């Protein structure tokens, strides 16, 4: 839930997002090198803040006698305890406790991808690290996919997401990877997969996602479905949008669509 969403990378603000996929979301690009320790520290602070939040509501409900204030603190106790529980005792890689743990390498992968994104946005064409090359987490696979395209290995790249479970993707991962799965199915002529993904694809494209992969996947999807006119309009939008992308992205896209 959120009244607006902010994307610092593109300098865009979307108001009245409410319950949309990007509701209350804030996106930004790192301006300097990020380390796994930085990310684990932020996650640890999140656990501490959640614990403090829960303690305040529980303590307030115990010591305050005035009716209105008492109701306020009592109402807040349940969500406070819920947040404390899911944020502290959840083993999912995306929750603060799991990210803060050194047994989980998600912080390492996240730091690496943030640094790669910073270099890409600065107009550089970075080298693929060993971590990105061997890790099988979705966001690492996405960057491995881009690096594989940079090398000109299109056929190999199109198979990278074959074993990804769409239901396990986060919203951000879904926005990046789902259109690539659709595009791969279209160019490989996999009608069975397109039929399986068709409803989800229609819903996804109806939200007008702005990333370049989604534009490319959308025109390929419309062409596969036989709507040549719509496909050409979308392809024109894709070509125009590609002009403003960093060299790394342009090279990957050129190798994918040639």
Protein language model regions, located:
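Catalytic Zn2+-binding segment of zinc metalloproteases
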Residues: 1-3, 89, 185
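Generic helix N-cap/helix-start motif at coil->alpha-helix transitions
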Residues: 104-109, 135-143, 170-179, 208-216, ...
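Small-residue-rich helix-interface/hinge motifs
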Residues: 1-32
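Residue-level signature for tetratricopeptide repeat
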Residues: 147-148, 183-187, 220-222
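Charge-dense, extended regions
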Residues: 232, 236, 244-258
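Hydrophobic transmembrane alpha-helical segments that form the core helix bundle
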Residues: 31-119
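Alpha-helical repeat scaffolds
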Residues: 124-134, 154-168, 190-205, 227-241
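Alpha-helical segment of the N-proximal tetratricopeptide repeat
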Residues: 105-160
């Amino acid at each position: 839930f959120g009244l607006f969403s902010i994307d610092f990378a593109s300098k865009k603000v979307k108001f009245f997002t409410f319950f949309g996929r990007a509701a209350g979301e804030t996106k930004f690009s790192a301006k300097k090198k990020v380390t796994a320790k930085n990310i684990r520290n932020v996650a640890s602070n999140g656990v501490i803040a959640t614990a403090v939040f829960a303690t305040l509501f529980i303590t307030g409900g115990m010591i305050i006698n005035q009716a209105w204030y008492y109701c306020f603190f009592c109402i807040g106790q349940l969500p406070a305890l819920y947040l404390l529980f899911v944020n502290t005792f959840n083993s999912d890689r995306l929750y603060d406790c799991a990210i803060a743990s050194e047994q989980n390498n998600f912080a390492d992968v996240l730091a690496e991808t943030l640094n790669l994104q910073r270099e890409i946005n600065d107009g550089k064409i970075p080298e693929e690290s060993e971590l990105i090359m061997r890790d099988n987490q979705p966001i690492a696979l996405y960057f491995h996919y881009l690096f594989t395209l940079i090398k000109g290995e299109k056929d190999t790249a199109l198979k990278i997401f074959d074993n990804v479970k769409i239901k396990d993707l986060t919203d951000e991962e879904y926005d990046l990877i789902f259109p690539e799965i659709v595009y791969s199915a279209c160019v490989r002529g996999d009608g069975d997969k397109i039929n399986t993904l068709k409803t989800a694809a229609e819903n996804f494209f109806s939200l007008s996602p702005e990333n370049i992969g989604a534009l490319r996947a959308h025109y390929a999807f419309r062409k596969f479905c036989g709507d040549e006119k719509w496909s050409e309009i979308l392809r024109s939008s894709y070509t125009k949008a590609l002009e403003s992308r960093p060299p790394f992205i342009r090279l990957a896209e050129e190798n994918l669509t040639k």
